[in-house]
Each structure stands twice: as structure tokens, then as C-alpha cells.
Amino acid sequence: RGDKYRRSNGSFMTRDEFNHHLSNMLSGLFSLGGQPDHILIEYCVQFDPIFDNVSYKGVPDIRIIVFLGYPVMGMIRLPTRLSDGKANLHQGAIGVGIDIPTGTTRRGVFGNEPVKEHPDTEHSIVGLKIPRWDELLLIAARAYELSGLGYVGVDIVLDKDKGPLILELNARPGLAIQIANGNGLLNRLQRIQALEAAGTLASDPEARVAYAKAHFATT
């Protein structure tokens, strides 16, 4: 707006502050090991209006854990005032477990506490149907061939105009998704490992999604 830039939390920074931030990025302030870095300018996501009542300022994202091509667990991360509009659980966002077969949210975690409502909007975060869920699962399953990673967290955002967009592929996704779902990953991973041992892993992403929907419900 004018000579100012709007942050994801709604606040503004001046052009000088913006230039200083870019300089910090290039100098490696935010990179692993403090090495000089590059800047990638991305499209500004306009998140789907279904999330209006359960998100504070920023863009919610959906993480799906994929093991050997099978989507085994999912959650949506909802920004809060505490997280400053960022969908980051370690900074105070809410993690909400998603039932793989139906794409419906089941339970949430805020810090270490179970929650059923967003702390800022006071709207329920339980029973929310994620739009285009089957498409999201298929995108996640295909990320296996795309990345070559046996275990990967696929982070997806839902844009109101462009639909599902991959935000990033995370080779070391955190384990808080288990708390958000009230289920551990081990049994699900072992089930896929059994398929691998039997030589029956599916090569078709659609078949892998169908298997996940049949076996990985979050109650």
C-alpha cells in the first residue's frame, strides 16, 4: 500500500525495512549454516474462504505425510495471533488432524493442549471438510515420484482461484502431526513396510490413495 508492504499478519513495513529484510536474507541470516542465500519471489496465495473463521491473518496449509508413496497422515495448520499469522506449530499455530478417508478434521492441538475451537475466532475447528481432499491426497502421493524421498511431508495450500498449490516438500517433517491426530505413525508405516516386504507396493498413485483411504482412518 503506497510505499509500504503488508506482512501476512496485517502489519506494514516501510520500504527501508523491506530492503533491510532482503539484505538479511541474501547475507544468510535465515539460511542453514549462515551461508549467503538467494531470494525467491512467489505468488501471493489467496486462501480458500472456507478457512476464514478458523485462521488468524495468515495462510493455513495442509501437511500430508507420505511414506513410500502412500499418504499416511494429514493435518491442517491454522495461524493464530500467537503465531503472528504463520502456519507454524512451534510458533503457536494450531495443528488439526484430518481423517484420511473423508478429509474431515477430527481434533486439534494448540501448544501441548487439545482444543476444539480456534483461540482467536472461537469457531469450531472440528468437523471441517477440506475442499478437494481426494485431489490433495493424489498430489501428495505423486510427490513420491517427484522427489524420490521415501518419507516426506507435503505442504499444500488451497488458493481460492488456483486451487491446490504445493508450498514445499519437507524431508524432515515434525512429529506433532501424531498429537494432532491422536494416532501414532508407527502402525501405519509398518503396514506400508509389510507391503514392501511382500513386493506388493502399488506403482499407481491412485491405487496408493485408495489404499490409504481404506486403512488410515482417524477416529
Q: Where are the regions a protein language model picked out?
A:
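Extended, basic/helix-rich recognition subdomains
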Residues: 64, 143-152
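Conserved N-proximal alpha/beta basic substrate-recognition cap immediately N-terminal to
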Residues: 1-4, 8, 140, 170
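Short amphipathic alpha-helical segments
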Residues: 17-21, 132-139
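Phosphate-binding site of ATP-dependent enzymes
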Residues: 6-109
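C-terminal active-site "lid" helix and adjoining low-complexity regulatory extension at the edge
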Residues: 117-135, 145, 149, 158-219
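Hydrophobic residue at the +6 position relative to the catalytic HRD Asp in the kinase catalytic loop
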Residues: 154-156
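Short beta->alpha transition motifs characteristic of CBS
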Residues: 1, 78-79, 168-173
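Intrinsically disordered, low-complexity Ser/Thr/Pro/Gly-rich regulatory segments
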Residues: 96-125, 136, 140
